[in-house]
Regions:
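Catalytic cores of the polymerase beta-like nucleotidyltransferase superfamily
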Residues: 1-346
């Protein structure tokens, strides 16, 4: 396995001083998937003060970035490396964070607390890949599986539910059945997680190649984090312009959209107003007049809850408000819309 030379140096310095050290988590997973390994986290048996002393003696800048959880950050040639002491977590509070952290000397204990088997591997050039939970096999078979008891993992940190969905979307992996069941059993715990953390995972999910399947299969989870979408799940569109119900249409437009987070978020929310304005004429044809304007206001409520940036808020709400307005496009209409809403929205 190839690691950035500075990561190798840090691991070697710790080994030379009698401590174990490994690259852990996502970088090991990505290497095995033959993907770029840009973000290397290091786990070690050395306590933070020992890590700091050893690396500073080698002329490396070290910052105390999370001492409570055993983390310091080393900076070499502009590259940042988080180095965390092996640990086991105490009881979790509110499905968010452990109340206590105990430092340990065994990499096995450290890996056992991690979320999914594909993220619970470690590596150094002396020992090779340490895989205690079948992560390599799950990578080979395209499976997302919780480490140990999935109910316990999700009760520890409910954001792991969104991480499972995100990995399934981005990697195209299937979520293992026991893990899937635990997701549905524990999805209400997402109400304990900050909206910003949920939005960060949702954005990554939307950018995945497998987003349509995940949004479909795990719609009940999406309904927990965006309850405004739930009326769309079974809202029929009986008219000549649609082959899916509202939610089916929504998720397929997400998949068809360019991989731009503003565009894909717009697609997720663009028809959210349809159930509120649905009417059916005497021929049994469904209509959704004013749904764009109504949907833009609902989307604003969703985005305020997620505390999105002003740029995302303005662009998404504007695109939703006007998404039904441009038909039979020609040069004159394009110029008119450029004048009305600005080039950034066209």
């Amino acid at each position: 396995m190839f690691l950035p030379k500075n990561a190798e140096k840090i691991i070697d310095f710790l080994y030379e001083n009698g401590y174990k050290a490994y690259a852990v988590g996502g970088c090991v997973r990505d290497f095995l998937l033959e993907k770029p390994c840009d973000d290397v986290d290091i786990a070690t048996s050395a306590l933070p003060d020992k890590v700091e002393r050893i690396l500073k003696d080698e002329g490396i800048k070290v910052f105390e970035t999370g001492l409570k959880h055993g983390t310091v950050t080393a900076v070499m040639d502009g590259e940042h490396y988080e180095i965390t002491t092996f640990r086991k977590d105490g009881d979790y509070k509110d499905s968010r964070r452990p109340e206590t952290v105990d430092f340990v000397t065994d990499i096995a204990e450290d890996l056992s607390r991690r979320d999914f088997t594909v993220n619970a591997m470690a590596y150094n050039h002396s020992e090779g890949i340490v895989d205690l939970f079948g992560g390599k096999e799950d990578l080979k078979n395209g499976i997302i599986r919780a480490v140990g008891d999935p109910d316990k993992r999700f009760n520890e940190d409910a954001l792991r539910i969104m991480r499972a969905l995100r990995f399934s979307s981005v990697l195209g992996f299937t979520i293992e059945e026991n893990t899937k069941k635990a997701i549905f059993d524990n999805m209400r715990l997402l109400n304990n997680i900050s909206a910003e953390r949920i939005f960060a995972e949702l954005t990554k999910l939307l950018m995945g190649d497998n987003a349509v399947s995940v949004l479909d299969e795990y719609r009940q989870v999406i309904g927990v984090i965006i309850p405004e979408l739930k009326p769309c799940f079974d809202c029929v569109q009986n008219n000549p312009w649609h082959i899916y119900n509202v939610y089916g249409h929504i998720i397929h437009t997400v998949g068809a959209a360019p991989k731009d987070k503003i565009i894909r978020l717009t697609m997720l929310l663009h028809d959210i107003g349809k159930p509120q304005v649905k009417t059916t004429d005497e021929k049994g044809i469904d209509h959704f007049k004013t749904h764009a304007a109504v949907g833009a206001e609902i989307a604003k409520t969703v985005m305020k809850r997620f505390k999105v940036s002003n740029e995302i808020y303005d662009k998404v709400s504007t695109l939703i408000h006007y998404h039904q307005s441009v038909e039979n496009v020609d040069d004159i209409r394009i110029k008119r819309w450029l004048s009305k809403i600005g080039e950034d929205y066209m």
